[in-house]
Design a protein with these regions (language model features):
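Conserved, well-ordered alpha-helix/loop/beta-strand core segments that scaffold catalytic motifs
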Residues: 1-27
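Beta-lactam-recognizing serine transpeptidase/beta-lactamase-like catalytic domain environment
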Residues: 7, 33-83, 88-179
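Short beta-strand scaffold segments in enzyme catalytic cores
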Residues: 29-31
Length: 179
């Protein structure tokens, strides 16, 4: 079968350089074309350099192979979706008729759910949908998610392919975890 490379050189370089300059030296960056799913950039740090093995065997240098990061964070890491999931929550609420984009929800900087308190990154005061998205207001989306319900959100997240492998055909790709 044929393999077509869709990487954008400038985006790929920017992703790799950005990861090199990060304080932790660890992370992943992926840029996709939303229309086609083509991978425009895919980087993981620390990077894996197979050239380090040239001329060595494990018997020659057993410590060397343990130092190499053979884990591609971009395709093998499993992460909480964080703010990217707010749009999924909004889509589920719109689909089920639970979202009035003009309705204002007050953000006091936290959301109480039973005995648990979830914090927002700021105190936004009254926000509508557009403010909730542009300010990434956690409280707004906690309220919308609570009103929409887990079943509706799960239906939409599956439509958006959450919990599945992408099919990128790279070794070790992991499916997301919905729970």
């Amino acid at each position: 079968s044929d393999v077509y490379l869709t990487l954008n050189f400038d985006l790929q370089r920017a992703a790799e350089e950005g990861l090199k300059k990060s304080k932790t030296g660890r992370g992943a960056a992926v840029a996709l074309d939303p229309r086609t799913g083509a991978v425009l950039a895919l980087a993981s740090a620390p990077a894996y350099d197979p050239n380090i093995f040239v001329g060595y065997s494990d018997e020659d240098n057993p410590k060397q192979s343990k130092k190499i990061n053979e884990y591609n964070l971009a395709v093998q890491g499993i992460y909480p979706p964080a703010s990217t999931f707010k749009i999924i929550t909004a889509a589920a609420a719109l689909e089920d008729g639970h979202l009035d984009v003009k309705r204002k929800i007050n953000c006091p900087g936290h959301y109480n759910s039973g005995p648990r308190v979830f914090k927002c990154w700021s105190t936004h005061g009254p926000v509508d949908f557009f403010d909730g998205v542009s300010n990434s207001c956690d409280v707004y989306f906690y309220v919308v998610a609570s009103e929409t319900g887990a079943a509706a959100i799960e239906r939409v997240e599956r439509k958006f392919m959450f919990g599945r492998q992408t099919g990128i055909d790279l070794p070790g790709e992991k499916a997301g975890n919905l729970y």
